[in-house]
């Protein structure tokens, strides 16, 4: 043993080492506290690097994880956190951590130290910001909390050194290894909490299902003819009960055939105006001139054929409710006239000068995208805000499938009463009906039930007797017409078509680019079947994802109308997601 080896460390060296150990201990204490209180440990890594920089002068911290865990052959790290680097999110991970270093740590699973990255891996391997100063890189593996043999990521930091490489010590490796261990424990604890939470939620779902099965099916919600037990229809009924007692205008929105007039009558029946009149006007069925006369009335002699004074619908609905169906179809010129009576409750008859005041509650309905119409200048924004005080969205029948059977039974009972018959549906017939999508909603369901009952040979309708089992489903035929596959002359006799499942055709083989097509006509002039035939399922899904699954926004992205988007959703059997 030499004298130098046996010589004890000097007091100054021991003091310096003691201070370094104390700083390392303090740093680990702060890091442990941070991880213990963090709901997301990875999100706290930048703060951890700040602690290492403040206490131990370890700068330029980097945490990189595998982009595709489990694929050892293709190590593809991406940086989660990188402090003290001027780096854009789009910059590659190699800007802060050399790829060669990441591969070494991922594959070996042991710490790595480099005093001169440029000498070992080339000048290009060194981050640009660190090329002008001596830097020691310390990188340690971050292991999967549940598979210790699998390296999940790399935790690295840089320390500046002089030409003698002073400043670095084995303590740096030990500290970073302990930080990685603390992060692993925090991740393990977080995963355990997530699993326990999921297990508790699953137990709760099972208990609720058991209780529901023991209680039996919920009683159908019935409110002035509204039938259903689904959560979607229950929410609509609850909204109607909340707003019916107020004087606020209600806007009913939904697809065609969802029963908007029925819900409008429910609003009226639940309101204090229930004993007053309920007057309905279909705004789409009348021209602008006739609509003005119908709503406001006219004086005798106001125009040719006005042989007597006629009260308008606003007057007739005084003290009650006026239902303006298809309000989205009125012309921009008439919208200003309607706005005045909605704002002030007064108007003049056509050809008259006397101002008439009324107390009428407005319930409007539309299946149009009014927001899109406002953006296009087709619908006045001030009128939109006046009628859309309480919007109620009526769910399509495909989103309330548990209501199909009670509704079908209601229509069957009504058919029997009207025709003095006693037709019943077999269980398999009900099952078949409940599997259908019904793009025409409740109106199509009623058509299906009445058709099956009218054409039935006996007292019981079997599944085989339904139109969809005989290749004569009306909604399926509509889809074939849009796709251009319907045979000329009508329905395809003998072809079995099930409208509940529609499989899209495989994409065609790539073909040479066609000749430039002539300029397309305006969007309103493009037939539905042309647009939907040109649209692919993937294009529709991409547009819906970009639009947050809002049909109106997706329609604008694709240059289509919301109605065309609705047909495309039915065509490709895509269910809307709630975000």
From Swiss-Prot:
Biological processes per GO annotation:
nitrogen fixation; phosphorelay signal transduction system
Q: Where is this region: Inter-domain linker?
A: 464-536
> Pro residues bias: where?
505-520
Q: Where is this region: C-terminal DNA-binding domain?
A: 537-579
Q: Which residues bind ATP?
A: 254-261, 317-326
Where do the sequence repeats start and stop?
505-506, 507-508, 509-510, 511-512, 513-514, 515-516, 517-518
Quick one: where's region Disordered?
Answer: 502-529
| Domain Sigma-54 factor interaction stretches | 226-454
Domain of life here? Bacteria
DNA-binding region per Swiss-Prot/TrEMBL record: 551-570
Q: Which residues are listed for a divalent metal cation binding in this entry?
A: 468, 473
Q: Which GO terms describe its molecular function?
A: ATP binding; ATP hydrolysis activity; DNA-binding transcription factor activity; metal ion binding; sequence-specific DNA binding
Q: Where is the GAF domain?
A: 40-187
Segments of this protein annotated with the region 7 X 2 AA tandem repeats of X-P: 505-518
Per UniProt, which keywords does this protein have? Activator, ATP-binding, DNA-binding, Metal-binding, Nitrogen fixation, Nucleotide-binding, Repeat, Transcription, Transcription regulation, Two-component regulatory system
Please name the PANTHER family in this protein's record.
PTS-DEPENDENT DIHYDROXYACETONE KINASE OPERON REGULATORY PROTEIN-RELATED, TRANSCRIPTIONAL REGULATORY PROTEIN
Quaternary structure, per UniProt, is: Interacts with sigma-54.
Q: What does this protein do?
A: Required for activation of most nif operons, which are directly involved in nitrogen fixation.
Give the protein name, as stated in the record: Nif-specific regulatory protein
């Amino acid at each position: 043993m030499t004298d130098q080896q046996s010589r004890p460390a000097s007091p100054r060296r021991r003091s310096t080492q003691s201070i370094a150990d104390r700083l390392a201990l303090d740093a680990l204490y702060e890091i442990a506290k941070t991880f213990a209180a963090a709901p997301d440990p990875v999100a706290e890594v930048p703060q951890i690097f700040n602690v290492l920089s403040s206490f131990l002068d370890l700068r330029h911290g980097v945490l990189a994880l595998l982009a595709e865990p489990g694929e050892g052959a293709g190590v593809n790290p991406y940086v989660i956190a990188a402090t003290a680097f001027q780096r854009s999110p789009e910059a590659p991970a190699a800007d802060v951590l050399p790829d060669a270093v990441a591969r070494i740590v991922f594959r070996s699973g042991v710490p790595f130290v480099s005093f001169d990255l440029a000498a070992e891996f080339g000048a290009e391997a060194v981050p640009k910001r660190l090329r002008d100063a001596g830097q020691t890189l310390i990188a340690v593996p971050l292991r999967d909390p549940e598979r210790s043999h699998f390296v999940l990521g790399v935790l690295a930091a840089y320390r500046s050194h002089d030409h003698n490489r002073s400043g670095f010590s084995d303590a740096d490796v030990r500290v970073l290894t302990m930080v990685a261990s603390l992060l692993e424990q925090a991740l393990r604890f977080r995963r355990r909490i997530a699993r326990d939470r999921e297990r508790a939620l699953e137990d709760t779902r099972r208990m609720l299902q058991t209780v529901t099965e023991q209680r039996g099916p919920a009683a159908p919600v019935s409110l002035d003819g509204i039938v259903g037990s689904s959560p979607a229809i229950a929410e609509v009924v609850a909204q109607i009960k909340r707003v019916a007692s107020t004087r606020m205008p209600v806007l009913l929105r939904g697809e065609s055939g969802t029963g908007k007039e029925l819900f409008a009558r429910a609003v009226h029946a639940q309101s204090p105006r229930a004993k007053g009149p309920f007057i309905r006007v279909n705004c789409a069925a009348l021209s602008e001139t006739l609509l003005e006369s119908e709503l406001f009335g006219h004086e005798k002699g106001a125009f040719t054929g006005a042989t007597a004074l006629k009260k308008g619908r606003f007057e007739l609905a005084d003290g009650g409710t006026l239902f303006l169906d298809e309000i989205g179809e009125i012309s921009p010129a008439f919208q200003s006239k309607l706005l005045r009576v909605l704002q002030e409750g007064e108007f003049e008859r056509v050809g008259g000068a006397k101002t008439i005041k009324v107390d009428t509650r407005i319930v409007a309905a539309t299946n149009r995208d009014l927001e899109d119409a406002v953006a296009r200048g087709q619908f006045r924004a001030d009128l939109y805000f006046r009628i859309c005080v309480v919007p109620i969205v009526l769910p399509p029948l495909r989103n309330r499938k548990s209501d199909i059977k009670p509704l079908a039974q209601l229509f069957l009972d009504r058919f029997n009463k009207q025709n003095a018959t006693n037709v019943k549906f077999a269980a398999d017939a009900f099952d078949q009906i409940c599997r259908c999508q019904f793009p025409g909603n409740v109106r199509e369901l009623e058509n299906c039930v009445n058709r099956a009952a009218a054409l039935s040979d006996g007292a019981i309708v079997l599944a085989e007797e339904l139109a969809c089992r005989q290749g004569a489903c009306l909604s399926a035929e509509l889809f074939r017409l849009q796709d251009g596959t319907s045979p000329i002359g009508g329905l395809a006799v003998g072809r079995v078509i099930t409208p509940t499942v529609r499989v899209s055709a495989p994409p065609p083989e790539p073909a040479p680019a066609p000749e430039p097509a002539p300029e397309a006509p305006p969007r309103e002039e493009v037939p539905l079947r042309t647009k939907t035939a040109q649209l692919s399922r993937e294009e529709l899904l991409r547009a819906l994802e970009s639009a947050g699954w809002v049909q109106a926004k997706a329609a604008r992205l694709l240059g289509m109308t919301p109605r065309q988007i609705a047909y495309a959703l039915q065509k490709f059997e895509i269910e809307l997601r709630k975000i």
